[in-house]
Amino acid sequence: MTVRVAINGFGRIGRNVVRALYESGRRAEISVVAINELADAAGMAHLLKYDTSHGRFAWDVRQEREQLIVGDDTIRILHERTLDALPWRELSIDVVLDCTGVYGNREHGEAHLAAGAKKVLFSHPGSHDLDATVVFGVNQEQLRAEHRIVSNASCTTNCIIPVIKLLDDAYGIESGTVTTIHSAMHDQQVIDAYHSDLRRTRAASQSIIPVDTKLAAGITRIFPQFNDRFEAIAVRVPTINVTAIDLSVTVKKPVKANEVNQLLQKAAHGAFHGIVDYTELPLVSIDFNHDPHSAIVDGTQTRVSGAHLIKTLVWCDNEWGFANRMLDTTLAMAAVGFK
């Protein structure tokens, strides 16, 4: 069965989902039927073909009126401003990938369903009343056919949750802190300009900028036992892609740094293959651009203090890795059936 997908919002994640679908060779499993985006069709085609972070798309891309032609595939282009105007029933859409970054509560999901979609997957953390929040590789087996409105969490949640699970299962986590060192994003300014967050009024290319993050809440969403036991801060740095996460956890069992690395390396080659990777090469952020893993552990940076405080550095391509997980979760949602 080929899952018929529509994408709502063709920004960074929406475009990378399409690219990842074609590059991963999963077109027999997922077919993009339609894309809803307020921007003009010519701009959509151009930005799919040419990308500053990920280079030229290997497939031929062209636009013909309100159609996007990718290779031999024709994708219908829509420009609807309201969810109730979307023709998902007419197009027999199985799963809508809502990549707007704007919608994310149950009401929005229900609007997609009312328009005829069978299921909805948000590309960002959603409200607590959604049917499920999935971090693929960790909890997708909890999905059921009746889970129709689902969140794929965030790129940083997908990065850190597998590592937290591995450390907790092995050593028992007491508490932890997380610092996200995140590439600049579209909600920042090219030059100084107004923003409700005064730090984000400043030019993104000229400063390291602290921003608010809900990552601690994202961790608790997946692992409720860590409520009030994790804190997180975030800074944006003047790069356009790839993120590093500094994870520090206090654990119950005594451990050495080499034992932590052995655990994470074994997981990367075993149970978490394709989700977690491990390296001891002297790499920098650009080297992880276009990496499909959710998390890449940098074993050279693992430290243990007093046998109970573990510090790790985990990398991710916050666009490409997450786009690949969107595809994984879509297939997992379809695999459990539709009600």
From Swiss-Prot:
Where does the chain bind NAD(+)?
Answer: 12-13, 81, 318
Listed A to Z, the keywords are: Cytoplasm, NAD, Oxidoreductase, Pyridoxine biosynthesis
Q: What is the name of this protein?
A: D-erythrose-4-phosphate dehydrogenase
Assembly and oligomerization: Homotetramer.
Q: Which organism is it from?
A: Citrobacter koseri (strain ATCC BAA-895 / CDC 4225-83 / SGSC4696)
Q: Does the keyword Cytoplasm apply?
A: yes
| Record PANTHER family | GLYCERALDEHYDE-3-PHOSPHATE DEHYDROGENASE 2
Gene responsible for this protein: epd
Could you say which EC number(s) this protein's record lists?
A: 1.2.1.72
Catalytic residue list: 155
